[in-house]
């Protein structure tokens, strides 16, 4: 049981003790004379003392002192943030327009890179200029839609096209030697039914079908079809991948039941092809961390501390046990390897040490494995003993040099990498919606297909199609040929280091294939993973640069800005996908408390329209409407809770919406369909839905899941006043099929 203690006079929370806590490990809080949070402190079961101290000036947070580092926030007129410092070093400074609108005019990084912004008379962004002279310009047509966007750095111009309902129906990129266009087709319920991508004259079509609950029932991409079966809780129980009528891969899933209640935790994952059958079995601890994975031959077990950080990996297949230790700020301090054992450790076979010697920024790595690490002012790594790095536009990795070979990166206006070259070898990349769609390496073209959840499904290479086999964490563990035989097999450690690459095509397809651990893009020559916003070094288990939120101070409220996945690489990934939960949280952090509305085309509305819980309500209310014999319309209202399922969208809704209020206005529509004398009257039911709530954090949550941790961080922030509650509503329509 979790115990809470409140001050008898002021009713403020003084301490929290979780079931595994003692009086020495509980979390304690103190407050200033205005009852704002002054300190928060706790000690983990491994002895790490975690703490944070808050300082205010005129109701604005001006200093945050963590266990290792002090962050300072300065403000100018109208309480607009003017700078962020770590210790005595400036990370970012801000200037604003002199007019009453006070738009952000320039962001200057501590390394003197900058971005300058320009606006039109309507306050719309019209241009960005960078320190190297490169520019991105924006223009708008008479309807307010974005006109073609030229990018001087990449030489690519992007044009967007919309239909009469303001839905994006096509975007096109053009440049020297580059032509990429994507067109979208929607049904009457605004569900995407097909997507046609044309790359340098070659077209690929992806089509979608949906079941009665508006869940994707099949997806066909580049001629590969994957179909889905769901259980009563909306969980995927089977995926079948086919090439035409031939089944290549069948995957089935079972789920854990805890205390008689269903969960989204996968218990078994069986992957079957004609040449390969593997059954993975998973076990979990009370916090939902994966504690063991077995493939029927070998088992890997994992141990975590009370902060859910990975502290030990026992890898039976590799014959290695690894232990990991961290300081009180979540920085890894030692990575030690031993001969495989699940019991008492023997003599260490390898040790990688970490040193954090920057007195201003104690989270910044200064030495690793005996090598000196250098970084620039804002935390971008410059050298690590094996590689050297240069940067542009603040946080874009411009070059990587390893073994005397320099790789130069090129990015588009959105900061997405489009090319890397060493002068002899060149990789070109084309992305569609955050997914790598095509890669060309020295004239060899690879096209990629994905399933409904964004997991890699297939790749064309050398005139043949190959199929990805992945585990539930998204790692590409094998590549299969058309007969289902594995031609490439990969193994990884917990942090994504590639341990082995085997198979008949290991030296060709296995080397060229960029999609590896977690489906991330792997740069074979440098050993880095490209995660779009940052680069990740699996040898160190850290990012090369600080979280992008450092430039606004937002990331300070969360976890270590260099740590990868909360130091829990087994159970988490760092997708670059768009998170509604993140946007809504940032609105609470940086907003003024004003109401927010999300329309039919918003990411929130799109995910709500696929929510099993909301669609079930719609079905029930349609039945009530029919039974009522209403002539015009009926209005229904109440509350519903989003289901925290297994997909990224499910978890996003659970974090952002949780439980909310809804109003549903249902009407009946009729039409006559047919041809010549063969006509039929059809009917459907349409609902205009308003989902609304107050976005706030009014209570502490038990447990140490990611959602609970984020809620409790925000709970403290709301008490302090730097998180502002606001009302929000999403307005959208859903409809039944015509019958």
Describe these PLM feature segments.
Residues 377, 393, 472, 537-539:
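A cytosolic small-molecule/anion-sensing beta-strand core signal
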Residues 591-595, 599-739:
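Catalytic toxin/effector domains delivered as secreted proteins or via bacterial secretion systems
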Residues 553-556:
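Short linker/helix segments within small regulatory modules
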Residues 20, 175, 180, 199, ...:
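Short, flexible loop/turn elements at secondary-structure junctions
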Residues 417, 497-501, 537-544, 559-583:
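Short, low-complexity export/processing leader segments characterized by acidic and small residues
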Residues 4, 98, 257-258, 352-358, ...:
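A motif-centric feature for acidic-aromatic and gly/ser/thr-rich catalytic loops and repeats
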Residues 1-86, 90-109, 113-130, 134-220, ...:
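Beta-strand elements of repeat-based all-beta scaffolds
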């Amino acid at each position: 049981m979790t115990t809470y203690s409140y001050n008898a006079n002021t009713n403020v929370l003084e301490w929290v003790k979780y079931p595994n806590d003692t009086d020495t490990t509980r979390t304690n809080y103190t407050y200033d004379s205005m009852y704002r949070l002054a300190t928060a402190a706790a000690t983990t079961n491994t002895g790490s003392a975690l703490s944070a101290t808050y300082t205010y000036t005129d109701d604005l947070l001006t200093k945050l002192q963590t266990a290792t580092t002090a962050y300072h926030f300065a403000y100018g007129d109208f309480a607009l943030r003017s700078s962020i410092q770590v210790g005595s070093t400036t990370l970012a400074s801000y200037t604003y327009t002199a007019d009453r609108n006070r738009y952000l005019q320039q962001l200057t990084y501590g390394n003197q890179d900058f971005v300058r912004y320009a606006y039109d008379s309507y306050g719309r962004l019209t241009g960005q200029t960078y320190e190297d002279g490169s520019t991105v310009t924006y223009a708008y047509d008479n309807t307010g839609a974005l006109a073609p966007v030229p990018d001087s750095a990449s030489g690519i111009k992007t044009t967007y096209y919309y239909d009469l309902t303001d839905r994006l129906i096509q975007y096109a990129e053009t440049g020297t030697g580059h032509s990429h266009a994507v067109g979208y087709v929607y049904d009457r319920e605004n569900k995407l039914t097909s997507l046609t991508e044309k790359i340098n004259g070659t077209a690929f079509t992806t089509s979608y079908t949906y079941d009665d609950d508006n869940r994707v029932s099949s997806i066909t991409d580049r001629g590969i079809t994957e179909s889905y079966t769901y259980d009563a809780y909306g969980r995927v129980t089977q995926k079948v991948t086919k090439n035409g009528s031939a089944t290549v891969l069948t995957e089935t899933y079972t789920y854990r039941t805890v205390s008689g209640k269903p969960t989204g935790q996968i218990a078994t994952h069986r992957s079957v092809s004609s040449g390969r059958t593997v059954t993975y079995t998973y076990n979990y601890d009370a916090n939902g961390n994966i504690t063991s994975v077995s493939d029927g031959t070998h088992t890997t077990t994992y141990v975590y501390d009370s902060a859910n950080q990975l502290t030990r990996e026992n890898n039976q297949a590799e014959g290695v046990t690894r232990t990991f230790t961290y300081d009180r700020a979540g920085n890894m301090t030692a990575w030690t390897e031993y001969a495989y054992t699940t019991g008492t450790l023997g003599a260490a076979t390898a040790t990688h040490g970490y040193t954090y010697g920057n007195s201003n920024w104690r989270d910044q790595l200064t030495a690793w494995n005996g090598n000196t690490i250098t970084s620039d002012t804002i935390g971008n790594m410059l050298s690590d003993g094996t590689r050297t790095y240069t940067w542009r536009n603040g946080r874009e990795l411009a070059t990587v040099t390893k073994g005397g070979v320099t790789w130069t990166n090129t990015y588009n206006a959105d900061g997405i990498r489009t090319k890397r070259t060493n002068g002899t070898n060149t990789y070109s990349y084309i992305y569609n919606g955050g997914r790598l769609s095509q890669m060309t390496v020295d004239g060899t073209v690879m096209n990629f297909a994905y399933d409904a959840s964004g997991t890699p499904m297939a790749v064309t290479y050398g005139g043949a199609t190959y199929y990805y086999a992945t585990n539930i964490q998204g790692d590409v563990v094998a590549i299969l040929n058309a007969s289902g035989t594995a031609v490439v097999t990969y193994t990884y450690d917990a942090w994504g280091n590639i341990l082995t690459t085997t198979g008949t095509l290991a030296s060709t397809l296995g080397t060229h294939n960029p999609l590896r651990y977690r489906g991330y893009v792997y740069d074979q020559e440098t050993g880095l993973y490209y995660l779009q916003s940052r680069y990740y070094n699996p040898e160190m288990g850290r990012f090369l640069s600080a979280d992008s939120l450092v430039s606004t101070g937002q990331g300070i409220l969360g976890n270590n800005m260099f740590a990868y996945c909360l130091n829990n690489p087994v159970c988490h990934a760092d997708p670059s996908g768009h998170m509604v939960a993140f946007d809504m949280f940032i609105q609470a952090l940086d907003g003024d408390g004003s109401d927010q509305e999300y329309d039919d085309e918003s990411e929130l509305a799109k995910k709500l329209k696929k929510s099993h819980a909301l669609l079930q309500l719609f079905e029930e209310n349609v039945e009530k409407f029919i039974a009522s014999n209403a002539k015009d319309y009926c209005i229904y209202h109440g509350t519903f809770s989003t289901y925290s399922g297994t997909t990224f969208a499910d978890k996003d809704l659970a974090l952002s919406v949780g439980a909310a209020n809804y109003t549903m206005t249902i009407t009946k529509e009729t039409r006559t369909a047919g041809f010549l004398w063969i006509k039929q009257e059809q009917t459907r039911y349409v609902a205009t839905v308003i989902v609304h709530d107050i976005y706030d954090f009014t209570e502490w949550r038990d447990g140490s899941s990611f959602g609970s941790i984020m809620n409790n961080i925000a709970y403290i922030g709301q008490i302090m006043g730097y998180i502002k509650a606001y009302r929000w509503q999403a307005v959208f329509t859903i409809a039944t099929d015509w019958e």
